[in-house]
Swiss-Prot record:
<dbReference type="GO" id="GO:0046872">
    <property type="term" value="F:metal ion binding"/>
</dbReference>
<feature type="binding site">
    <location>
        <begin position="187"/>
        <end position="192"/>
    </location>
    <ligand>
        <name>UTP</name>
    </ligand>
</feature>
<feature type="binding site">
    <location>
        <begin position="15"/>
        <end position="20"/>
    </location>
    <ligand>
        <name>ATP</name>
    </ligand>
</feature>
<feature type="binding site">
    <location>
        <position position="72"/>
    </location>
    <ligand>
        <name>Mg(2+)</name>
    </ligand>
</feature>
<dbReference type="GO" id="GO:0004359">
    <property type="term" value="F:glutaminase activity"/>
</dbReference>
<dbReference type="InterPro" id="IPR017456">
    <property type="entry name" value="CTP_synthase_N"/>
</dbReference>
<dbReference type="GO" id="GO:0044210">
    <property type="term" value="P:'de novo' CTP biosynthetic process"/>
</dbReference>
<dbReference type="GO" id="GO:0005524">
    <property type="term" value="F:ATP binding"/>
</dbReference>
<comment type="subunit">
    <text>Homotetramer.</text>
</comment>
<keyword id="KW-0665">Pyrimidine biosynthesis</keyword>
<dbReference type="GO" id="GO:0042802">
    <property type="term" value="F:identical protein binding"/>
</dbReference>
<dbReference type="InterPro" id="IPR033828">
    <property type="entry name" value="GATase1_CTP_Synthase"/>
</dbReference>
<dbReference type="InterPro" id="IPR027417">
    <property type="entry name" value="P-loop_NTPase"/>
</dbReference>
<feature type="binding site">
    <location>
        <position position="223"/>
    </location>
    <ligand>
        <name>UTP</name>
    </ligand>
</feature>
<feature type="region of interest" description="Amidoligase domain">
    <location>
        <begin position="1"/>
        <end position="266"/>
    </location>
</feature>
<feature type="binding site">
    <location>
        <position position="140"/>
    </location>
    <ligand>
        <name>Mg(2+)</name>
    </ligand>
</feature>
<protein>
    <recommendedName>
        <fullName>CTP synthase</fullName>
        <ecNumber>6.3.4.2</ecNumber>
    </recommendedName>
</protein>
C-alpha cells in the first residue's frame, strides 16, 4: 500500500492539544491494523530542544537512538507501538543547517538558495524519509497558523498534496471553539478566522477537530461547516476529557478514524479498542483507591517538565489498579524550611532528573527522610546521584560527599564527570544519550521488577557513579544491582533492608505506556500501595 500522509495543524491558541490529537489518531489507526509512524515539525531555530530551559520548553523526550526531542514524541510513543528516532522530530534549525551545508558543498550548482524550493524541498524530503515502511504517516506541524515561523512548513505540506495527490494526503486542523460566559454561548469566529488563515496559504482542511469544554451543538457544527467549507460530518468535537487516555475512545465515538480511512480510501478491519476501554475503566474506578506520590524536584512550577514521569506513574497505578495522586514538592522549599511537613502524607517519594546545584540539598534531605522512615523511594538520573551522595554522607560517614557537577574541588566525588565527557566543549547533543544495555543482578528488587537480566534503557546525562567508592558503599550495604558491562558503569542502586529503595541512572519513564506500564513504575507504585495499607 502506498503511504498515506495526514498533516495536523493548529489554530487560535498554542497548547491546543495537537500532540494528543495526533497520538490518539495514531492509536485508532493502529487498532484498525495499520502500520503508523509519527513525526513532529518544530518551527523554532534551535537545532533541538536539548539545551532549552524546561521552564520554556517543558520536557526533553529522548529516543532510543539518542535524539533529544519535543515532548509530543512521548505522547506518540505512549499511544502507539511506534519506536521513534531522530527522523521523527526536526526543527527549522535542522532544516536550515542541512540546506546551508549542501550549499557549501556545492550541491545546488551555484544556484540562488531560497525558501521555495530549497527549504520546502528539504522539509518534504525529511517527511518522506521518516514515512518509509508505514501505511500512514501522521505529521504534526508545531506552532499556530498565522505564526511567521511556521510558514515554510505549511508551504511544504501544501505542496505535498500537489505532489502526492488528494487521495494520499489529508489535512486535519485542530481549533478552538470557546464558551463566552458573559454571552452564555459558544463562539465559532476564532475557528472561522483560523481556517481563513490556513486557506490563504492554500490549505483547505479536510477535517476540523474543534476543542471545546462542553458539547458542541448541532447548529454550531452546521455553522462551522458552512463558513469553513468542511463537510458537516468532518466537523468533529473534541471535548475536554478527565483522562487523556479517554481521548482515543471519544474521537472514535465521533467517527474520526472512520472519516480518515474513508477519505484516504483505505480498507481496514474494525477497530478493537478493548485495551483502551480497560485502561479508562481502571482510571475511573480503581479497585484499590489512591496512593500519594511526592515528586521532589526543581521544575515543579511547570509540571510539563516532568510529563513522561507523571504519565509513567499513572501507568504504574493502572498496573496496580489504583489511582496515583502526584504531590509536587519544591526541593528548594525543603532546603529552606526542612523536610518535616512536606512528606508526612505521602506513600512514596520520587526524586527525578535535573541539572545544576539548585535544590540538590533539599533532595538529599527528602531521600534521607524516605530511607530512614522506610517509605518507598525511587530516584531517576540526578535522583540516583543524590541517593548515592545521601548514602555516602549518612551511612558511610563521608560528610564531604558531593558531585563534581556542583563542586569541581569536591573532597569526596562520589559522582563525577564521565571520562568521555572530559574533552567535550559543546553542550548541544553531547551527553550520553539514548538506549544503552544494562545487566541486572538476580535476587534484587530490580530483577524482581524486570524478571530478566539483560535490559536496555534510555539515558541523558554527563555524570556517573564514581567506581572508586564501590567497595566502601557496598560494604556498608548498598547493592549495585544494574551494571553497564561495556563501560563498567553503575546503572541501578538499591537497599536490600528497605521495603523498596531503588534508583537508576537512566530514564525508565521514556519507555512506559498505558497499555504496557514500565516494570520499575509498576513495582514502585505496588510498594507504595503496600506502604499505604500498612500505615
Amino acid at each position: 500500500m502506498k503511504t498515506k500522509f495526514i498533516f495536523i495543524t493548529g489554530g487560535v491558541v498554542s497548547s491546543i492539544g495537537k500532540g494528543l490529537a495526533a497520538a490518539s489518531l495514531g492509536a485508532l489507526l493502529e487498532s484498525r491494523g495499520l502500520r503508523v509512524t509519527m513525526q513532529k515539525l518544530d518551527p523554532y531555530i534551535n537545532v533541538d530542544p536539548g539545551t532549552m530551559s524546561p521552564f520554556q520548553h517543558g520536557e526533553v523526550f529522548v529516543t532510543d537512538d539518542g535524539a533529544e526531542t519535543d515532548l509530543d514524541l512521548g505522547h506518540y510513543e505512549r499511544y502507539t507501538s511506534a519506536r521513534l528516532s531522530k527522523k521523527s522530530n526536526f526543527t527549522t534549525g535542522q532544516v536550515y543547517f542541512s540546506v546551508i551545508d549542501k550549499e557549501r558543498r556545492g550541491d545546488y550548482l551555484g544556484g540562488t538558495v531560497q525558501v521555495i524550493p530549497h527549504i520546502t524541498d528539504e522539509i518534504k524530503s525529511k517527511i518522506i524519509e521518516n514515512a518509509k515502511g508505514a501505511d500512514v504517516a501522521i505529521v504534526e506541524v508545531g506552532g499556530t497558523v498565522g505564526d511567521i515561523e511556521s510558514l515554510p512548513f505549511l508551504e511544504a505540506i501544501r505542496q505535498f498534496r500537489f505532489d502526492r495527490g488528494a487521495g494520499n494526503t489529508l489535512y486535519v486542523h485542530v481549533t478552538l471553539v470557546p464558551y463566552i460566559r458573559t454571552a452564555g454561548e459558544m463562539k465559532t469566529k476564532p475557528t472561522q478566522h483560523s481556517v481563513m488563515e490556513l486557506r490563504k496559504i492554500g490549505i483547505q482542511p479536510d477535517i476540523l477537530l474543534c476543542r471545546c469544554d462542553r458539547e458542541l451543538p448541532q447548529d454550531m457544527k452546521k455553522k462551522i461547516s458552512l463558513f469553513c467549507n468542511v463537510e458537516e460530518s468532518c466537523v468533529i468535537p473534541s471535548v475536554d476529557s478527565e483522562h487523556i487516555y479517554a481521548v482515543p475512545l471519544a474521537l472514535n465515538k465521533e467517527r474520526l478514524d472512520e472519516q480518515v480511512v474513508e477519505k484516504l480510501n483505505i480498507w481496514t478491519k474494525q477497530p478493537d479498542l478493548t485495551p483502551w476501554q480497560d485502561v479508562v475503566e481502571t482510571l475511573r474506578h480503581p479497585s484499590h483507591g489512591e496512593v500519594r506520590i511526592a515528586i521532589v524536584g526543581k521544575y515543579v512550577n511547570l509540571t510539563e517538565s516532568y510529563k513522561s514521569l507523571a504519565e509513567a506513574l499513572t501507568h504504574g497505578g493502572i498496573a496496580n489498579d489504583c489511582r496515583v495522586y502526584l504531590k509536587y514538592v519544591d526541593a528548594e522549599k525543603i532546603e529552606e524550611n526542612g523536610v518535616e511537613g512536606w512528606l508526612d502524607d505521602v506513600d512514596g517519594v520520587l526524586v527525578p532528573g535535573g541539572f545544576g546545584e539548585r535544590g540538590t540539598e533539599g533532595k538529599v534531605l527528602a531521600i534521607e527522610y524516605a530511607r530512614t522512615r522506610q517509605i518507598p523511594f525511587f530516584g531517576i538520573c540526578l535522583g540516583m546521584q543524590m541517593a548515592a551522595i545521601e548514602f555516602a554522607r549518612n551511612v558511610c560517614g563521608l560528610a564531604k560527599a558531593c558531585s563534581t557537577e556542583f563542586k569541581n574541588d569536591c573532597k569526596e566525588p562520589v559522582i563525577h564527570l564521565m571520562e568521555e565527557q572530559k574533552s567535550v566543549n559543546k553542550k548541544g547533543g553531547t551527553m550520553r544519550l539514548g538506549a544503552c544495555p544494562c545487566t541486572v543482578t538476580k535476587g534484587t528488587k530490580a530483577f524482581d521488577a524486570y524478571n530478566e537480566a539483560d535490559i536496555s534503557e534510555r539515558h541523558r546525562h554527563r555524570y556517573e557513579f564514581n567506581n572508586t567508592y564501590r567497595e566502601l558503599m557496598t560494604t556498608k550495604g548498598l547493592v549495585l544491582s544494574g551494571i553497564n558491562q561495556q563501560k563498567d558503569l553503575v546503572e541501578i542502586i538499591e537497599l536490600p533492608d528497605h521495603p523498596w529503595f531503588l534508583a537508576c541512572q537512566f530514564h525508565p519513564e521514556f519507555k512506559s505506556k498505558p497499555l504496557v506500564p514500565h516494570p520499575l513504575f509498576r513495582a514502585f507504585i505496588g510498594a507504595s500501595l503496600t506502604h499505604r495499607n500498612q500505615r
